[in-house]
Amino acid sequence: MAQDQKPTVVITGASSGVGLYAAKALVKRGWHVVMACRNLEKADSAAKSLGMSPDSYTLMHIDLGSLDSVRKFVTQFRESGKSLDALVCNAAVYMPLLKEPMRSPEGYELSVATNHFGHFLLCNLLLEDLKHSTHNDPRLIILGTVTANSKELGGKIPIPAPADLGDLSGLEAGFKAPIAMIDGKPFKAGKAYKDSKLCNMITSRELHRRYHDSTGIVFNTLYPGCVADTPLFRNSLPVFQKVFPWFQKNITGGYVSQELAGERTAQVVADPEFKQSGVHWSWGNRQKEGRESFVQELSEKVTDDAKAKRMWELSEKLVGLA
């Protein structure tokens, strides 16, 4: 990479929350950010509100709930002629109040379609672009969550149920109506979200296992802390949106601001101390600025290699890669 050429990072869901503040933090580090979002007007307004220079970011449309939209994004990105030096899979939908599943254009339950299938396809398609990066340290980073890791307290909470892919029978059967859960069981909206994030963490680990040694690309997940006032919770009950941030700030002490979470994400993307691949970074779910990062142990639901391999194969089939 030429000395005067900025490295380029694609961030999904960069119009608000952690993705937006990660974009800001990476721009400060000298990166050019491709803000991959559904609402480009919203993304542009948000970037300007944080003082990001118009030449420091590029807006590109993507709807991760549509596999066709993901493919169109990849085509548009390649036509732009930009290098790809890092990919941050941040966007997510969380719809805990649904009684019946919403469906993607392909007929898949929407939270799994958006959070897992969309990012799974994006990662696989852009892997070739990352391989050709001239940056000395290309990385692919996926946002994880405490609720998908049963090694942590947040991952044990049975509301509505802990993350668990079961025997993957829902994927095995094609994951279309009436099926709406990866394990093939009755629909539970909150669990569908947790399962999708568990898939994200498995995907990152599989990417590392399959491609790190041959490409040098760093594949990691992170949990930047409990961002209790993130727009992710916009589809929750209004009382939850008011009480949850207060509870995390005043009772658990686990609250982390959107800005600090974005800064932590940028660290994992760009800073040299995060070059280790195949791990899950955490800060112990605390706001404290000086808190040290550490590699968080993951549960057997993530580290089961046989199930991970099968989940990968089924996901390839369902997104049209196999």
From Swiss-Prot:
Pathway: Porphyrin-containing compound metabolism; chlorophyll biosynthesis. One of its GO terms (biological process) is photosynthesis. SUPFAM superfamilies: NAD(P)-binding Rossmann-fold domains. The keyword Transport does not apply. Keywords: Chlorophyll biosynthesis, NADP, Oxidoreductase, Photosynthesis. It catalyses: chlorophyllide a + NADP(+) = protochlorophyllide a + NADPH + H(+). This is Light-dependent protochlorophyllide reductase. It comes from Leptolyngbya boryana. The gene is por.
